[in-house]
Amino acid sequence: MNSTNSTNSTTTATSTNTSTQQVVTSLVSNGTIFGVFVIAFLILRIKLKRIYEPKSSFNLINEEKKPEPLPQGVWQWLKPLLKKSDNFVIQQAGLDGYFFLRYLFIIAIYCAVSMSYIFPILLSINASNGNHESGLNQLAYQNVKHRGRYFAHVFCGWIFFWGFLYIIYRELYFYTSMKQAVLASPRYAKKLSSRTVLFQTVPKQYLSEEEFSKLFDGVKRVWIARGSGSIEAMVKARDNMAIQLEGAETKYLKAALKKIKKLNKKSPQLSVSDNIAEYVPDKKRPHHKINKVAKFFFGKKVDTISYIKEELPKLNQKVKALQEDHENSSPFNSVFVEFESQYQAQVAAQITTYHAPLFMTPVYIGIEPSDVVWFNLRMFWWERLGREVSAVSAIVALVILWAFPVAFVGMISNITSLTNEVKWLKFIYKLPKQLLGLLTSLAPTVALAVLMSFLPKFIRGMAITQGAPSKQNVEYFTQQAYFAFQVIQVFLVTTLSSAATSTVTEIVKEPTKAMDLLASNLPKASNFFMSYVILQGLSISSGALLQIVPLILFYVLGAFLDGTVRKKWNRFCGLSSMQWGTAFPVYTNLAVITFSYSIISPLILLFAAVAFFLLYIAYLYNLTYVYQESPDARGIYYPRALFQTIVGIYIGQICLLGLFAVGKGWGPIVLQVIGICVTVLIHLHLSAAFDHLSKVIPVDTMKPLDGVSDTPSFKNIYKGIESTKVKKNTFGANIDMDGIKELPEFPIKKYHKRSESVTEQQVENSIFSENTFEYQFNPANEANADGHAINAENLIEDVPLLADGDTMKIPPAPWWKRFLKPHIYYSYKAVKSRLPEIYGLVDPDERVNDFDISHAYDYPAVSAQCPELWIPRDPFGFSKLLISDVSGVVEMNDENATIDENLKFTLRDVPPPYNDVKDEANGEANGEFDTASKENNPFADPKYKEEESRSAV
């Protein structure tokens, strides 16, 4: 018996030492990576502006969005970056980026604040007079011996979990106010997408412009797409074939120049012929295999240029035939409808339109023409249901199958416990401590990150399969599915497999106590997740700053990958962007892990606070100075992320309940059940209060205070009607206009940016003292002919809205009162002050030409032209010969780009008109170059030449 106890104590000591070594090794290894990456970033940032400050250094975005450069010093940039105001971040990152950064910052601050009361209480209780654990386990729940101490964990859990539920309430209030203010601003309200609604599963009766216009007031245009089901695939095949020809022609040209260079070395006075074929024999011309099924082994090899010259006209003719006949094709059962204003569009999107179920639904608003997934606009309701079931089933099946490799990773993280049963694994103890720590900490966390990196592409494919009509909806579906993957695989499966591994010996001996043993060993898995949080906070954040992949692609591999001038153009002018469907879930799951272990192993709060703050800095820098905006989803990912974080609260509370049950602490069990019930109640109320409100724009933020004026969101469609005595409402009833009295105007509070003349007292009394202050409306301010106030800063007419109608002054208050009263200090009027000035102006990229607007939502495939190809101009005139050779097949030119004798490309201006074809090799949408950038040629900038001298291209 004594020998058994001795063995168990030895095993426990070994396991404890290993778990501590696991965290220490992770901290050291990831800290080293962090240091190397940050030092490299600080050095390279000063020189490599295309990678680290492209938005402020080159004309790649609209001038109005171009940020001021950060200071050039090694560390001098950090303080100005952290002091950037909300309106600056919104202007640079958009709503989606702003709320992503806000999420990271809030988690970091909440973890840091929570340490102030959890550490003094729980760490001292866990560490003193307990189960004689050592190392980090001494500071965790498993070291608690006396049941009476469970009450401390209960009450700390109440404060921590319910406190964050209050934070979620504040953030949801802020989100709805901010979104309403943004969408009601002139910049968004005047967008075509804001007043255009997509109706799907439209009955045949309404698949005509005339009939559909009868359903709503204020209909301006109706787009009903028609086209063959095969035309989109055929257009893509044609465009890819044209791009293949462009690559082959460039390769052919480079082969000739390479040969001439070689001949010049032998004979410097060589006279160059104008016949390119003299320098490139037939066998050296570009070739490819055409058998799609087995082209690598049995495909027939053909001359690429000759083959495409023959096949492209045939394919182009088929495309043109389908385009000319598209009017005879069956219409899509999805309809885009433009309304006179955003108000009419919102009304149409929110009312019940059709008497039968499953028709005229789903309904979407705010989809840009460039973001439409046209493939999914022709589905019937039964097809959509079938696809949804298939997509969800495929994801569930993958979750189950993915559990096996993830469980194996969890077992590795606790492999020292597994050696108790699997004797032959005991050789691991002979490894050096540092190597053992790497094996049990860094290797599993890296393996887990690599495993999860394969999933996003599959999930996005399932999003398209189930019928997502836009890029934003693809990301929204991905956010939900990928979060489920993250929680189940990264957290739950890893936790259970790690706990099961550490108790396998005891479970084999006493199977009836399996649940008790798992519950008691569950806290030990926290050490693995501390390592995972450290990995994310140190290695991932510094890697995001250094941008290793873009750095290597641009300066090293670009010479090999950018075989055409178009690819080089895309490399230089194409800015990276975030994919929110996968970005949010990774860090939401990190918050779930932190919250789940916050009471069981409080030390994780320290690592999480540091990790989230470092991630906040990294992404703040990238989103404001490096990345361009992703397809605008208007912030829809943020409320979902907040509600998903509640999963961590539930898991944390349920785990505590299980641990109390194992320890037979009946009083804490009752209190914990009460805590869970309160959490459920709050969750339900938050969902009921904000679920609908977060998806719509309220009427009072769109309609004018006087009831008749036009606003950016509202157009009075009855204005100007001759008979003003009697009008008809939407339902045809008569309205006596004499009986309607116009409301009197009264003072409206405004919010302006802080100026240098602001006194310290005004700043102290401000609602958001960091960047704004409040003052009463001054009737002496400028006014237009109608008496409406003019905002002198942005010269946009500011018509008072119904939501501005509260005359009550928002009282100055200290920070704690502002924290406790979000209904006042996060109200619509208060939040309006955070909007950038450009939100008072119309987007310069917005369509204003009536012709462009009338064709905005036309099915692109029915009018898509064959892309115009682009090759560089060479010193010997070969490019002109190549252009004439394909003149009857496809348009091609050699303007704005040259190639020298050393095969180096030089870009001089924008490429020829191009049809936004997806370049498979580069993964970027070609031809997407901003109008402002075309006017301000980035290649005429001396900074471009500096970057070229550093580039390997």
Swiss-Prot record:
GO terms for molecular function: calcium-activated cation channel activity. One of its GO terms (cellular component) is plasma membrane. Disulfide bonds: none annotated. It is found in: Membrane. The chain crosses the membrane at residues 23-43, 103-123, 148-168, 392-412, 435-455, 481-501, 540-560, 575-595, 599-619, 642-662, 666-686. Residues 910-953 are annotated as: Disordered. Pfam families: PHM7_cyt (PF14703), PHM7_ext (PF12621), RSN1_7TM (PF02714), RSN1_TM (PF13967). The modification Phosphoserine is found at residue 949. It is a multi-pass membrane protein. Keywords: Calcium, Ion channel, Ion transport, Membrane, Phosphoprotein, Transmembrane, Transmembrane helix, Transport. Residues 942-953 have a biased composition (Basic and acidic residues). InterPro entries: Csc1-like, CSC1/OSCA1-like_7TM, CSC1/OSCA1-like_cyt, Csc1/OSCA1-like_N, PHM7_ext. Signal peptide: none annotated. Belongs to the CSC1 (TC 1.A.17) family. Acts as an osmosensitive calcium-permeable cation channel. This is Uncharacterized protein RSN1. It comes from Saccharomyces cerevisiae (strain ATCC 204508 / S288c).
